[in-house]
Design a protein with these regions (language model features):
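Terminal helices and disordered tails flanking the catalytic cores of nucleotide-processing hydrolases
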Residues: 1-8, 255-297
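Conserved alpha-helical "signature site"
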Residues: 1-253, 291-296
Length: 297
């Protein structure tokens, strides 16, 4: 079968459903240093559904506030810039990812739940490894596999050949995708990220999370460490999380790349970390349920 053309990929990207415009506007405002809490509150209130989702997330167990948050202004003030930003991307990601992707054997909700799981795991590891801003790791984990919503049909049509290649040549699923189709879901994901005008740090997560060994040497150390943490969270999500597709266990955990950013997974590191992540699964379930109820409003 001939490889997929760039024009076919771009065509699929252009067919993606419209994302919530107020959420996109807020995400872009938060990339601007001049934006203040009052301006953000005013824009969020323009969309009642988006407002409802923000408030429901604020009051979920995942955020653990001791009192109920009842207004957008209060939410913006209490959450802080970084947490609000990751919350907005959570709402955007649900719209984009909460769909079946049969090419990867993902039923409706699987890709979304997997993304949410990886996000929570990445944030936890980010705190553990003292990242300057673990919320960026959360957002990176959330959006890392957005390329699958575009590449899924092509993977489905070529899955037998891709799987056979992983076995025959002992390569991971990402490399086999590219060999058979001409693209992989990380490359395609960067196209989606650019269409949505995501910030460069998130584009880099999407492009490199499976292969942190290929990170550009010019990348700031904190960003390189964050992407490596998403790489680790991605691997552990496939092991102990939910929603992994037919490619879930066909990737390699790059211990050397992790070591280069100061994360040593030798000894009982992984065993202890997995225990911590399993304890987070009820919080992930509550977060997913909060989003589901909010989406029905």
């Amino acid at each position: 079968m001939p490889k997929v053309t760039l024009q076919e990929i771009i065509g699929k990207v252009e067919q993606l459903p419209q994302l919530p415009q107020v959420a996109l506007r807020v995400s872009r405002m938060m990339e601007e240093s001049a934006t203040n809490a009052e301006k953000l509150s005013d824009v969020i209130r323009l969309d009642p559904s988006f407002t409802s989702q923000v408030l429901r997330l604020c009051n979920s167990a995942a955020y653990g506030f001791s009192r109920r948050i009842s207004t957008v202004k209060e939410a913006v003030a209490i959450l802080g810039h970084s947490t609000l930003k990751s919350m907005v991307y959570t709402i955007i990601a649900k719209v984009a990812l909460d769909r079946p992707v049969p090419g990867y054997s993902l039923s409706e909700g699987d890709l979304w739940y997997n993304a949410l799981t990886c996000a929570v795991y990445a944030k936890h590891i980010g705190h553990r490894e003292r990242l300057p801003d673990p919320e960026v790791a959360f957002t990176g984990g959330l959006l890392r596999d957005i390329g699958k919503i575009v590449l899924g049909d092509f993977v489905g049509a070529n899955y037998a050949e891709i799987e056979a290649l992983t076995t025959k040549e002992r390569i991971d699923f990402l490399d086999a995708e590219e060999r058979v189709i001409g693209f992989n879901h990380s490359i395609v994901g960067t196209r989606v990220a650019e269409k949505w005008n995501l910030p460069p740090v998130l584009v880099n997560v999407i492009r490199h999370h499976h292969k942190p060994v290929k990170l550009p040497p010019t990348l700031p150390p904190a960003e390189a460490k964050m992407i490596s943490i998403v790489h680790l969270a991605d691997a552990l999500t496939s092991m102990v999380g939910k929603g992994a597709g037919n490619d879930g266990l066909m990737y390699c955990l790059d211990a050397d790349a992790l070591m280069r950013v100061g994360i040593n997974i030798q000894g009982d590191y992984l065993e202890r970390l997995i225990g911590e992540l399993v304890d987070l699964n009820p919080i992930i379930k509550d977060l997913a349920e909060s989003m589901s109820i909010a989406g029905d409003n």
